[in-house]
């Protein structure tokens, strides 16, 4: 197409056909000077001398192509050496040069420079550059197609290899799973036995400590040390009160002793201790760890003056109050609950014996082997899924877009960095830091029916505030390099991105032989 345009540009050698001003070459046969003129819409026929007489006779304005008489008429710019052009007849002789050859201002007094040759030269250079890009891009496109053919064959071979190896790996997994389960059975039994023995030892130790607490409480309650705890001795501990009046009555004490008046050590532990253990408070104060006093900086005090007689009398009076306070401070300490022994190393489960540890090590080795092969199987299955997806993906008529599959491209603007990962996602993030926002994930090819692979659609991006989810259309343009050239937001939350790629280059027409005699515009 581009070369065809280049061939149409050289018009300097074309034969000039006589026709009224403003008439195109394709319409000259309607304007024969020897015949009356019929309006192009067929509504009227007029003498030929009324064509371009600056009076509008035809409704369609076709009788005044070279004047501004008809508001709906059109003037044809020949623009020899460049592209012909139609302009509104109202713009003829308006003092503005609309045609590059200046023919529209033939009677306005405005002098128009003929710029058609220069415009044609620049147009030709631009088209030649575009044609060169198309040729080079298409050359690269053919390479991309061949590379995908080779890569696809390699991936298919790799897929077959993985699918064949998968069965062998699945068999290994099942074999090692059975070996693991076989090794874990004695491991569980050995661990359970070890824990059971330790828990029994802990229970025995706990019972022993409870007996020691009960014995200690019995000794404290047995004030006369006769080997028996009586009702009176039990009543010395009001905290054992059961009716909430703050005192342990004789009836309450007797109820605690199961109706007896006293109890020995054995009965005390079997019957009494369980009822009082949570309320009982020991008379032995706990050993407090001295807290070091904080030393405050000494303040300089003024010198002490000898007291006056009145001050001496005032100082003598508080002495009695101080003595009373000292007596209160000497009151016996409150009863304390018996202190349970702090946890020791004996309460931690001991290490396994050599035989049990050997069983555990064997089970662990079986687990490690199984997990390693199972992990390899999962990685193989993921590779198979990935290869199947890539091989079956629609990468264009000949797979020319396949090379984009594992790539990402960025475009940095004043505010954002846009990132396109073809066939995966589009995102944007603030240029100066911040989390990315999804502008859509791969949806489908979105070009028109006759050019399906000219655009991509990415959908279901991050939702806009009180709006739809973001989406992006990517237009694919022919270029020698792969680069994102622009990103815009023509509609709210709908983005348009342009990607230059050799894969979008069409096949150019054959180059026409150059004509040395007619190379001027």
UniProtKB/Swiss-Prot annotation:
Pathway: Glycan metabolism; N-glycan metabolism. Keywords: Calcium, Disulfide bond, Endoplasmic reticulum, Glycoprotein, Metal-binding, Phosphoprotein, Repeat, Signal. Ca(2+) 3 binds at residues 222, 224, 226, 228, 233. The keyword Disulfide bond applies. Its main location: endoplasmic reticulum. Expressed in kidney (at protein level). Residues 406-507 form the MRH domain. The keyword Metal-binding applies. Heterodimer of a catalytic alpha subunit (GANAB) and a beta subunit (PRKCSH). Binds glycosylated PTPRC. This is Glucosidase 2 subunit beta. It comes from Mus musculus. The gene is Prkcsh.
């Amino acid at each position: 197409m581009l070369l065809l345009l280049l061939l149409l540009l050289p018009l300097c050698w074309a034969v000039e056909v006589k026709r009224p001003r403003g008439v195109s070459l394709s319409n000259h046969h309607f304007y024969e000077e020897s015949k009356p003129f019929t309006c192009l819409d067929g509504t009227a026929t007029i003498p030929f001398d009324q064509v371009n007489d600056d009076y509008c006779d035809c409704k369609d304005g076709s009788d005044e192509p070279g004047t501004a008489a008809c508001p709906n008429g059109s003037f044809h710019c020949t623009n020899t050496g460049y592209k012909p052009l139609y302009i509104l007849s109202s713009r003829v002789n308006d003092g503005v040069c609309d045609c590059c050859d200046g023919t529209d201002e033939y009677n306005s007094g405005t002098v128009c420079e003929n710029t058609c040759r220069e415009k044609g030269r620049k147009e030709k250079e631009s088209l030649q550059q575009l044609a060169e890009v198309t040729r080079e891009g298409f050359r690269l496109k053919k390479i991309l197609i061949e590379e995908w053919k080779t890569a696809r064959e390699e991936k298919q071979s790799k897929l077959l290899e993985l699918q064949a190896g998968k069965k062998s790996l699945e068999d290994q997994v099942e074999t090692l799973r059975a070996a693991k389960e076989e090794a874990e059975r004695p491991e569980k039994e050995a661990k359970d036995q070890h824990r059971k023995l330790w828990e029994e030892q802990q229970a025995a130790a706990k019972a022993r400590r409870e007996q020691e607490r009960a014995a200690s409480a019995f000794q404290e309650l047995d004030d006369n040390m006769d080997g028996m705890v009586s009702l009176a001795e039990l009543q010395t501990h009001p905290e054992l009160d059961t009716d909430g009046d703050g005192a342990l009555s004789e009836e309450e004490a007797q109820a605690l002793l199961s109706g007896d008046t006293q109890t020995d050590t054995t009965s005390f532990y079997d019957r009494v201790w369980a009822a009082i253990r949570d309320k009982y408070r020991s008379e032995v104060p706990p050993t407090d760890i001295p807290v070091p006093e904080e030393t405050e900086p000494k303040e300089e005090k003024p010198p002490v003056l000898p007291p006056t007689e009145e001050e001496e009398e005032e100082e003598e009076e508080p002495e009695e109050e101080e003595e009373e306070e000292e007596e209160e401070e000497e009151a016996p300490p409150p009863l304390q609950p018996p202190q349970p022994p702090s946890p020791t190393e004996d309460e931690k489960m001991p290490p396994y014996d050599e035989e049990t540890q050997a069983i555990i090590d064997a089970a662990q080795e079986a687990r490690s082997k199984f997990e390693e092969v199972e992990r390899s199987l999962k990685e193989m299955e993921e590779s198979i899924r990935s290869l199947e997806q890539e091989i079956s993906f629609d990468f264009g008529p000949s797979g020319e877009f396949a090379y984009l599959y594992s790539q990402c491209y960025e475009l940095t603007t004043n505010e954002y960095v846009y990132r396109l990962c073809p066939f995966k996602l589009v995102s944007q993030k603030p240029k100066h830091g911040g989390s990315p926002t999804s502008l859509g994930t791969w949806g489908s090819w979105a070009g028109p029916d006759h050019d399906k692979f000219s655009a991509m659609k990415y959908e279901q991006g991050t939702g806009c505030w009180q709006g739809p989810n973001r989406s992006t259309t990517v237009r694919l343009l022919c270029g020698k390099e792969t680069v994102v050239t622009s990103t815009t937001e023509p509609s709210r939350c709908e983005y348009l991105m342009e990607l230059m790629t050799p894969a979008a280059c069409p096949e150019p027409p054959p180059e026409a032989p150059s004509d040395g005699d007619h190379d001027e515009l």
